[in-house]
Amino acid sequence: MSIASDPLIAGLDDQQREAVLAPRGPVCVLAGAGTGKTRTITHRIASLVASGHVAAGQVLAVTFTQRAAGEMRSRLRALDAAARTGSGVGAVQALTFHAAAYRQLRYFWSRVIADTGWQLLDSKFAVVARAASRTRLHASTDDVRDLAGEIEWAKASLIGPEEYVTAVAAARRDPPLDAAQIAAVYSEYEALKARGDGVTLLDFDDLLLHTAAAIENDAAVAEEFQDRYRCFVVDEYQDVTPLQQRVLSAWLGDRDDLTVVGDANQTIYSFTGASPRFLLDFSRRFPDAAVVRLERDYRSTPQVVSLANRVIAAARGRVAGSKLRLSGQREPGPVPSFHEHSDEPAEAATVAASIARLIASGTPPSEVAILYRVNAQSEVYEEALTQAGIAYQVRGGEGFFNRQEIKQALLALQRVSERDTDAALSDVVRAVLAPLGLTAQPPVGTRARERWEALTALAELVDDELAQRPALQLPGLLAELRRRAEARHPPVVQGVTLASLHAAKGLEWDAVFLVGLADGTLPISHALAHGPNSEPVEEERRLLYVGITRARVHLALSWALSRSPGGRQSRKPSRFLNGIAPQTRADPVPGTSRRNRGAAARCRICNNELNTSAAVMLRRCETCAADVDEELLLQLKSWRLSTAKEQNVPAYVVFTDNTLIAIAELLPTDDAALIAIPGIGARKLEQYGSDVLQLVRGRT
């Protein structure tokens, strides 16, 4: 049979064909986005089996997700049916690392660990929580989740409890809690898994650790395993952790029949322990390795590919040295567009309007995605799509109002509303959110930071509402939030996809909107804290590259100059767009992103519009100078403290700081002047008015 007529070779381009026909032995396929790597991998496996180099049962293909493993198995079965060679390539095992290790450990366990049994932990949460308690660490739910994540990172990085503190410092990693505390919890966690009842608890990392140890330390096990599997294929090799590499090395032994496929410039999971160094060092470990580059992109238009190339061309560091120069193979399409907006609601409204036009012109909603850096950014887009009547689904996360921390916040606000407080709404909201995790600075832990981002988004949403309706009180706010929550479409497969850039890896759509591309969000602020030229910042650049390469035809990139309508426009476009995005102006909003709710309050000093609840309370811009009677302010605070103690309520329930400042500035001398200050209603006038006016009169 000629190559042209061989169904395992026909239809491949010359780069793919080179990879498929490479001889047995170490092969490294550097495959860019959209270059057909899965097709190339499966055809290589089928070719090796069909040519008799290896039996189907002796091949082990591993990847990182069940979805990817399932896709590989499906394609191998299809090739088996199409080739009609009788090779049985459809029987090749394509598994995740953990699934492969689970099967192997179950088979070898009794031979290497004597008579003790084992049980797999579906979740380590309960054991980590118990370990934290036994070390006298008072850990919240988010703390426990962050501790579990940190233990996973350590084990994936082959770092034990006794080495953790030193390793974290050497890696310049920001642990979610004190490193010594984490090490103590980690040590206790490992001790708790050895229950002493004849059953050992194993987490998913233990599957890999015990599998590697069994092969490394038992010659009979190694011989049996290495006789069973003789050829290995690893997909997404740039995402391998040191622990997974240890397992792979144990599988191989002193052999080199290994094919790896990856792209170091799509390494975006370093927080899990993934490292591109194994891909970058492949030719050093195997000097005779064949290296094939796949650079023909069949997914995206030349216009999208060109932008991706320009973004990654500016990359720095060792990873950048392996970058591929993609060449778009599709028909030309529209040029990617760049849009600057005055604020986030305007950005979201414009994106929703653009999506509506795409859908009207025939693009299925399921072929459209909105991608952002952090999950908390989804709220404004959920609202905009809801207002536009466009169904959506949130991938890799929950809808904003379905998140646990938001449900907790709304419940807490409902309880406060039952106390009939007249305190300034913004202050009430922040006081309620503070115990739930809203701090002045974002926490370090991943889960705690996600909670903080969601709570911050809720607080900013309240500020947006107050800017439009300065007289808004808590019952009205809760009604508005309930309206938003109830109006949100339930997740539907046919809807527009909302996803973080991390969750979008491995997926593609006809149209992609990359939103919120402002410095401090992408690259994210905690990456910038490591320095502008640091590896964390470079990983953020790779995130943008991954996002761009998700688009087949339509691609729009956008950012907002401020969070809220009328807010200070201090944001800048992502530094990754420097020299790429054209000079832009803030785009006009299609229609209005918020309902017109009457004239805005204005500063009593400069007459500018007031856009925050604090400014409305003070009746001036927070930057405008004003005379505050400092002695009166101290007296008011002292009076508030004693009154709050008498009534057994928080101080803000009596009056907030901003209300006291307004009183000390405006010096009201009668009931009419006092009640004119926002935050002082009829009830508070009746309850506290005489005391306050007596203090003011004593100073005037």
UniProtKB/Swiss-Prot annotation:
Record-annotated HRDC domain positions: 626-700
One of the record's GO cellular component terms: cytosol
Family annotation (InterPro entries): DExx_box_DNA_helicase_dom_sf, DNA_helicase_UvrD-like_C, DNA_helicase_UvrD/REP, HRDC-like_sf, HRDC_dom, HRDC_dom_sf, P-loop_NTPase, UvrD-like_ATP-bd
Signal peptide: none
Annotated coiled-coil segments of the chain: none
Enzyme Commission designation: 5.6.2.4
Keywords of this entry: ATP-binding, DNA damage, DNA repair, DNA-binding, Helicase, Hydrolase, Isomerase, Nucleotide-binding
Region annotation (Disordered) ranges: 565-595
Domain UvrD-like helicase C-terminal intervals: 302-553
Catalytic reaction equation(s): Couples ATP hydrolysis with the unwinding of duplex DNA by translocating in the 3'-5' direction; ATP + H2O = ADP + phosphate + H(+)
GO MF entries: 3'-5' DNA helicase activity; ATP binding; ATP hydrolysis activity; ATP-dependent activity, acting on DNA; DNA binding; DNA helicase activity; magnesium ion binding
Annotated spans, Not required for growth: 601-700
SUPFAM superfamilies: HRDC-like, P-loop containing nucleoside triphosphate hydrolases
Stretches assigned to the UvrD-like helicase ATP-binding domain: 10-301
UniProt record, GO biological process: recombinational repair
Cofactor(s) needed for function: Mg(2+)
Recorded consequence of changing Q266R: Loss of growth, no ATPase activity. No DNA unwinding. Does not translocate along DNA
Known outcome of mutating E508A: Not essential for growth, no helicase activity. Wild-type ATPase activity, translocates along DNA. No DNA unwinding
Gene deletion effect: Essential for growth; the 100 C-terminal residues are not required for growth.
Its job: DNA-dependent ATPase, stimulated equally by ss- and dsDNA. Has both ATPase and helicase activities, and translocates along ssDNA displacing bound streptavidin. Its essentiality for growth does not depend on its helicase activity.
Family as reported in the entry's similarity comment: Belongs to the helicase family. UvrD subfamily.
Protein name per the record: ATP-dependent DNA helicase UvrD2
Origin species: Mycobacterium tuberculosis (strain ATCC 25618 / H37Rv)
Phylogenetic classification of the source organism: Bacteria, Bacillati, Actinomycetota, Actinomycetes, Mycobacteriales
